[in-house]
C-alpha cells in the first residue's frame, strides 16, 4: 500500500499535472473564446441516442453552439472508486458486489481502487485495465471513525493529483457517509461548507465526474449528520455532472443496483465540445455551464461549471 502522492515520484510535478489535466492545469489564452470539451451523461428508462440538434448549451448564461458530440467509449474511460476507510466493518458484505462490478467493466476500462484516509487517497496500484488484479485490492475498511479527515479533502487531493496522464473520460465513485467534520455543526442551518465547494471546483477544473453512494461510517452518526452528508454528496454530484445513487436512513442492503446504474451512466456518456471564453487575467477560472436537451424522456447530467479550454486537444 502506498500514498497516492507516491505516484509522483521521479516526475516533475508540473510536467505530470500538465499531462494528467490536458489544459486545466496549463496556461490558456486569457481572453476570447477557446475550444472546450466536457463529459455529460444521459439518464433514460431505455437507452436512446442523444440527438445533438436538441441540445442547448449555455456558457455564462449565453447560448453557445454545440460544435461536436461524441459518445464516450467505455473502454477508453478511467474509473476511480474511492472508499472511506472509516466505513463500518459491515461494509465487508458489499465487497463481492464491488468486485463483480469491477470485473464486469468493458475490456480496456482503466480502474483504480483507493481508500480515503488522513485527507488523501491510498491505493495498492495505479489505474489498470487488469480488472481481476484491481478487484483483488478491494478490502474491508479499517473502520476507524473519522479516519478520512474529510472525504472532500481526499477528493480534492485525488483529482488534483490524478494518477494517470491518459486523456480518457474521468469518473469517480465515492463510497462514504459524506459528512464534513471540519464544517462544524451538521444542522440544517449549516449546510454551506467551503471544503465541499473547494472539492467540487477542483473536480470541475480536472474534468472529473463525481458520483456517490452514501454509506455510514463507524462513528455514531445519524439524523441531521446523515442528512448533511448525503446533501453534500448530492451537491458535488450535481456540480460535476455525476449522480448520487443512494440517500436513505440505513445503509443499502446491496450495492449491486447502484453499481449497475453507475455502469449505465458511464456507457451513456458523451463528450460535448463548444466554445467558452476565459476571463482576462484569470487562467484558472471556472465558467458557468448549463447543458440541457429537449429530447423527450431524456435527462442530461453535466457539470455546472467548466474550465475554458479544458479537454481540448
Question: Predicted segment positions?
Answer:
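Bacterial N-terminal signal peptides
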Residues: 8-20
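Scaffold/interface architecture of coatomer-like assemblies
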Residues: 25-313
